[in-house]
């Protein structure tokens, strides 16, 4: 008995190992074997594709293929494209051979089986392509009348009505839209019925409303009314627009003569300020004499003063009412005003002055009365010896109102906002004329 139990355990182990081996060899399947072949339809390689040509089959009948393998080549009016397999399988039978032309999308072109199926025991499924739908389209089954309580009105019979003899449907220039193609397929309309549908879309396109009106599911006049409304709204109608009459401006009421309007007040002139500073020209006279002795060149005082004025007008402070320009505001946004040594062109022009001082000598003190001259006797003149004439040397050329000895008053009359600016100018003129006159020679 012990040996029999041991033998049973060994047999059970061997059976379990055999089952595990078979499962490992066969592998895991997401779907069971169908034991029936499947139709392979003509695919739509683009949204507007309706038919194509089969150039060649890459897989022959009875051959196996894997996911990603190229099954066949399809030619369209635009290009030749490969059709790849989405999963493993077997090509059981080719319905549309190489060189087939005008194969409609959705037509059966082959029969395939799943991997591991025995194709010798499988049956070919019936064709469910659009050809059967076309055959059944000429004789559609009558639809029963709706119940009286139905809220949807029936505008026409649901069966397609033949076109009127007087209505001429234009030839279709564009392919059907995907939504229109799906609606035609669902209602089983063939090509002859589609050619009788009156298009109301832009460029002669067939819309879904045209198909529904042809089938009698909506009012037949609705698509045309909608198309006419869109056509009218696409153009601006100005036929009813009337030009308004120009409105004359109202005349102001005449004012009474007893109360005349006050005269407009003239703007007040800006306040003025007088800035003055005493300056000595002694150092300038000494420099003038040295140049005359050493170089034999005589420079008048006006030259020294004009050069000193030119130097003093450079880089003056800005007026207190100075407004920055647009360029300066933009430079501030960029942070250029904080860059050391950066001065905008507008600020350079603003810091340049154009002052010309007014020079006056101080009023001298009241002169002492001159002694009375002695009465000249004619005898003394005749008896006196003749005197030699003395020639006075030419004196220095002076600026009108300036004196060579003492102090001269340099003054400016400027707006109140430039008072500080004028003081800086006069201080610079004073410094150059009294301390650095030689700087004005070059």
Curated annotation (Swiss-Prot):
- Please give the residue ranges the record annotates as the region Disordered: 119-169, 244-269
Sequence positions bearing N6-lipoyllysine: 78
Q: Which GO molecular function annotations are given, in alphabetical order?
A: dihydrolipoyllysine-residue acetyltransferase activity
Q: Which residues form the Lipoyl-binding domain?
A: 37-113
Ranges of compositional bias, category Low complexity: 152-169
Specify where it is mainly localized: mitochondrion
What CDD domains does UniProt report for this protein, alphabetically?
lipoyl_domain
Q: What Pfam families does this protein's entry cite?
A: Biotin_lipoyl (PF00364), E3_binding (PF02817)
Places the protein is found: Mitochondrion
Q: Does the keyword Hydrolase apply?
A: no
* Transit peptide limits: 1-35
Q: Where is the composition biased (Basic and acidic residues)?
A: 245-257
Q: Site (E2-binding in a hydrophobic pocket in the E2 core): which residue positions? A: 330
Annotated segments matching region Interaction to the E2 core: 317-336
Q: What GO CC annotations are associated with the protein?
A: mitochondrion; pyruvate dehydrogenase complex
What Gene Ontology terms for biological process does this UniProt record contain? pyruvate decarboxylation to acetyl-CoA
Q: Which residues form the Peripheral subunit-binding (PSBD) domain?
A: 175-215
Keyword terms of this UniProt record: Lipoyl, Mitochondrion, Pyruvate, Transit peptide
Q: Does the keyword Transit peptide apply?
A: yes
Ranges annotated as biased composition (Pro residues): 139-151
Q: How does it assemble?
A: Eukaryotic pyruvate dehydrogenase (PDH) complexes are organized as a core consisting of the oligomeric dihydrolipoamide acetyl-transferase (E2), around which are arranged multiple copies of pyruvate dehydrogenase (E1), dihydrolipoamide dehydrogenase (E3) and protein X (E3BP) bound by non-covalent bonds. The Chaetomium thermophilum PDH complex contains 60 E2 units, 12 E3BP units, about 20 E1 units, and 12 or more E3 units. The units are organized in 1 E2 60-mer, 4 E3BP trimers, about 20 E1 tetramers, and a maximum of 12 E3 dimers.
Domain comment? Answer: The sequence organization of E3BP is highly similar to E2, having an N-terminal lipoyl-binding domain (LD), a central peripheral subunit binding domain (PSBD), and the C-terminal core region connected by disordered linkers.
Its function, per the record, reads: The 10-megadalton pyruvate dehydrogenase complex contains multiple copies of three enzymatic components: pyruvate dehydrogenase (E1), dihydrolipoamide acetyltransferase (E2) and lipoamide dehydrogenase (E3) and catalyzes the overall oxidative decarboxylation of pyruvate to form acetyl-CoA and CO(2). E3BP is responsible for tethering E3 in proximity to the core, forming the entire metabolon, and the number of E3s is limited by the number of E3BPs.
The entry sums up its family as follows: Belongs to the 2-oxoacid dehydrogenase family.
This protein is called what?
Pyruvate dehydrogenase complex protein X component, mitochondrial
